[in-house]
Amino acid sequence: MDGSPEVTAFILAGGKSTRMGSDKAFVEFDGRTLLARVLDLARSVTQDVRIVGSAEKFASFAPVVEDIFRDCGPLGGIHAALRSSLSELNVMLAVDTPFVSWTLLQYLISQARATPDAIIVVPASEDRRQPLCAIYRREFADVAENALRAGNNRIDRLFDLVKTRTITEAELNVAGFSSGIFRNMNTPEELKTEEGRV
């Protein structure tokens, strides 16, 4: 061991929050900001927690990683996160998914440990992979960088380029997780509707 943590968690907080009308990270949900919720969640699985976003906005909350490829969406954030990481396993979490649980993260990490040849371990829900609640090994940074340099910002196009362990919705259900766990908050109306369900 070289002293680096086995797991680092990254909060992806660089979105524009256009539909929300204000920065999602600081929107309150059941009495706490979405950022505070996801920081606590991330810290429940590792002490090494970082925010991918603006240092000006987030430096007082946790160490911040800023995008190397600007305005390239989540793939740019994941790339920057992995370039900054010394960990083999890297948890990526969107700031606006308050229903993701500690038990789900532990499950994903255990699946990543059980499939050491998988570069990505990603759950699927309603026939869609959930790349913003997934585990990435550091080497995915090279794949992401090649795509970003070529102008391809779509992460879903990259899953087939590397060994990817997709956890099916059926597997998640057997493990006790519902598809609703990945719901994200995009509008004030969604926040209001979902409050009280955490």
Task: Annotate each predicted stretch with a short phrase.
Residues R183:
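Dinucleotide-binding Rossmann-like beta1-alpha1 core, especially the glycine-rich loop
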